Each structure stands twice: as C-alpha cells, then as structure tokens.
Amino acid sequence: ETVDHQLTSSVANLETLASNRRDFMAQYLAAPREAVVKGAEGPVRAWILAPGKQPDRADRLAALLRDEGIEILRAASPVKASGLRDAWTGKTLAMDLPAGSFMVPLDQPAGPLARALLDPHVPMEAGFFKEEREWLERGKGTRIYDTTAWSLPLLYGVDAYWTGTKPAGDWKDERTQEARGSVAAADPVFGYLF
C-alpha cells in the first residue's frame, strides 16, 4: 500500500511538472541568478573560516562545503580584514587573517545553501513560538529538534566570521581536485581492487 501511494504521488508530481515545464524551467534557471544578486546585495556578503588552533577542522569544513558545490576561496598570503562578526560571540572584530584562511563568498549560485549551513542563528517567526507554547501546554511535546548542528562552524569548532564586505587580498579559487589512480609497481604480480 505504501509503495502504491508513493507511485501515485510520484506520477502526479511528474504530470504536474510536465504540464508546467516552461514555468518550472524559468524558475530553475532564475534561481541561481537571483542567489548571486541576493548574495551581492545582502547584509552578509561572505563567511571567513580561519585555521585557528586546529586547522584540520577548517580544512575538513571547507572540503565539505566544496563537496556540496559551494565555491571557496583560500588566502595565499595574510589578509587584513575589518568588520568581521565572530560566529561564536557576535562581536565585531578587525584582524589579520593568516594565509590558508578560507572565504565563502555569498554572491554565488550556492550562496543560500552556504548561509543555511554556516549561519549561527535560525530565525523563527513569533507565531511559531506561540504555537510551540500551546503544544507544550497541551502535553503534545515540542516540535523543535536539536539546532546545535545547524551551524557547521559551531559544530566543527572553527574560528568563523561573517562580514558585510569581502576582505581584499590574494584569494585563490579552491576547487576540488579529482583523485587520479595509478599502478605504482612496474610489473605487479597481484593487486587489490576496492
């Protein structure tokens, strides 16, 4: 029965998509362009991930973001930056970012995804909190689940900052390099395939 319902739902979705394909394609093509504009004009223009005391964590977080299609830049040399907002405290700082720091510009097609993964605050409407209180008072339990992992810089323990202006500096594009395999021995007798 469950599979039948899933099939019915999938077919209905495909039929709706097919009959509205022009509108869907227009929205599909417009969304990345709108994300670039919104990222260039919004109050948060970039996220900075500094190596800090545990640079491997910043490296792993940057790799995760790249794997999700988010564009990352890396400082080839130290960068002077001001107007940075600390993700942990919210304080505004000016600092010298060390070489190896990452910048996640938000004027990119994946800007909204970057914000969703990096922002430390998840805004909720006041009406939601009123409904939540009513649910709790009626003994229905909470509808909120753990939000501590919603901000990846906080989850990874990375020194992270957001800024309304992208810091000028020698930033290099950080694209994921595809791993290339090869056989190291000249005349192997046997090998393993994983």
Model-found features: residue ranges?
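Intrinsic-disorder/low-complexity accessory segments
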Residues: E1-F194
